Amino acid sequence: MKIIKIIITKRGAGKYSSLFPFVLILLILVSVFFAGCIGTSDEQTESNATITVIDDLGREVVIPADVKTVALTGAGSARYMVYLQAQDMITGVDITDSMTDPNTETRPYMLAYPEIANLSLLAPIRATINAENALNISPDVILFSTEGAEGGVIADEATAKTGIPVVCFEEYEPSDDFDNFSYNIRLLGQVVGKEERAEEVITFFGDMRDDLIARTPELSMDEKPVVYIGGVSNRGTHGMLSTKPEFVGFTLLSANQKVADVPATNLGTASANIAKEKLLEWDPDIIFVDLGTLNAEGGGALVELKTDPSYQSMTAVINGDIYTVLPDTSAKSNHGTSFANAYFVGTILYPEQFSDIDPIAKADEIYTFLVGEPVFAKLNANTGSLAYQKIDLNTI
C-alpha cells in the first residue's frame, strides 16, 4: 500500500488560526481516503498479475500468478495434485477421477482422498473439456493430462470458448524418463504454487531410483533367473499373456526378462499381449502376477496357471515360484505402487542385497510420502489379501 505523507506547518496566529484544527482533520480524512483508494488499486493489480509458463506441449500459457483453484482432465490427473499436496485446490475432475469404489479401488490417491470423486464433473469423457461445465466450475486454470499433440488443439479450443487457461502435461515414468517426469512435476508445482513440494517429490523418486539400481548385483544375464510378469492391467483387466515390457521391478533391477528381446515395434510399453508359445519358450524360472488380473474374465492369470495344462510344464509352476504384486496401472501409472513393487521384486531376485527391506513397510513409507496415508492394507484388502506373497496354486 502506498502511503501519502502530509506535512503541515503552523506559521503563527492570525485571523485564520482558529480554522487550523478543522483544516487538519479535513486533510487527514482526505489522506486516508486516497490511501485506501491506492491500496485497493494495488491489491487489484496484484490479483490481476499473471505469469507465463511453457507447458509440456511447448505452448506458452498465461495463467494467474496466484492460482487458487484448478479443474482437471485426463487419466489420473488428480494423482499429481495429491503428490503436490494441492488436492484442496481441485474443484472439478473428468470422468476418470469422478468414480471410485472403496472395496475395489487400487489408486492410492483415491483411497487417501475418495472425496475427489464427489467434485464437479468437468468432462463426461476422459481427456476432454466440456466448455459449459468449465464455465460453471470457473477454475483459475485447467490442468490437462494429454495423450498426444491433439491435446493442444482441445486445450486451445477450450480456452477460446471459456477464457480459462489450459496447461497440458504428459505422463512420464520416473523410472525410465526421469528428466521429463521432473519437468512436468516442476511445471505443475509452479502452476499451483507448490514449487518446494515439487522438488521434494522429484528428489524422492530420484533417490528410490538410484537406490534400486545401486542394490542390483553385477551379474551376467545368464547368471540371473528368467522372470516374467503376467496379468497386467491396461484399460481393463487381462490374463496371463498380458505383460509389461517396462515393468519397473525388472528394468531398474536389470532382471532377465525375455520379453525385452522382442523387437520394440511388436510391443507396447505400458502393456503388451504375447503369444502363449513365446511364454512357453521362455520358460520363466520366476513368475510375478499383477493382482489386477483377479477381476479378469475367467479368474485371470492365477486361475490360468492352475488350470491350463500347457502351463504345467513351466519351471516356475513346477517349482512353485509364483509371486504377486499390486496393480500399478489404473488411470495410467501409479508411480508409488510401481516402486513399491520393485522393492518387493528385489527381495525375491536378490535377497542378500535387499535383506534390510520389509516390502510392506517400504510400500507404506512410499504411500505416506506421496498420498499422506499408509494405504497398503487397503490395497491388499482390495486385491484378495494376496499382495506380496508366494502363491500356492492349490489354494486358488
Report residues per predicted region.
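Structural recognition of the beta-strand scaffold that forms the well-ordered cores
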Residues: 71-73, 91-94, 141-145, 166-170, ...
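Solvent-exposed loop/turn segments at secondary-structure junctions
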Residues: 76-79, 96-99, 141-142, 147-151, ...
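His/Asp/Glu-enriched short active-site or ligand-binding loop at hydrolase and phosphoryl-transfer sites
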Residues: 246-268, 319-326
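Extracytoplasmic substrate-binding proteins
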Residues: 60, 154-236, 317-387, 391-394
